[in-house]
């Protein structure tokens, strides 16, 4: 019973010794746990350096690696072949002012327009293939109708325009002065195809910039999050990180 009263009573607070006033310029007084952590970190680094020295001594300079065929060295130091990783000012502004949702939305819009332009280019190119033989087959009931068949009358156009395979103008349109000044030529097709190709190239470049911006923002978001990570290597001038596996609960 007496021990219970003894434990219930207030006890003296044991505080750790602080840094003396005359030594305050040296910062906080180091405790044993601080020294142990610093010593453990020092020993870990020394072990890594020892392993690296052993690997350097055991390395055979005449040994062949397949990476030697596409790698370069300068004074024995490997050089990384960097791609054009520069980002223009517009992309930097996007990184600073917009979030990844805005980038993904506009990238989806660009992809849809790229697909539409690719289909449009295939359609325009298919219309003007001069080497392709194009035929329009008309079926009749008997031989007599086949002999008396008039293509101009069947297509309701003139004899001059009946040979066209597309954009065939009808007589009522000619009488109403419609489409008479709109000849469908190969130059028009080439201009349309050239315009579509130029726009497609510009949109592909913009999609590539948006993809780089999305990758940069996603990497920054992951680096700011929780979890242990380690920088493993650099590929094409870009760092590659590896995160520690965590148990899902």
From Swiss-Prot:
One of its GO terms (cellular component) is small-subunit processome. Residues 1-24, 37-59, 223-249 are annotated as: Disordered. Component of the ribosomal small subunit (SSU) processome. GO terms for biological process: maturation of SSU-rRNA. It is found in: Nucleus, Nucleolus. It comes from Schizosaccharomyces pombe (strain 972 / ATCC 24843). Belongs to the UTP11 family. Keywords: Nucleus, rRNA processing. The keyword Nucleus applies. The lineage of its organism: Eukaryota, Fungi, Dikarya, Ascomycota, Taphrinomycotina. Its main location: nucleus. This is Probable U3 small nucleolar RNA-associated protein 11. Involved in nucleolar processing of pre-18S ribosomal RNA. GO terms for molecular function: snoRNA binding. InterPro entries: SSU_processome_Utp11.
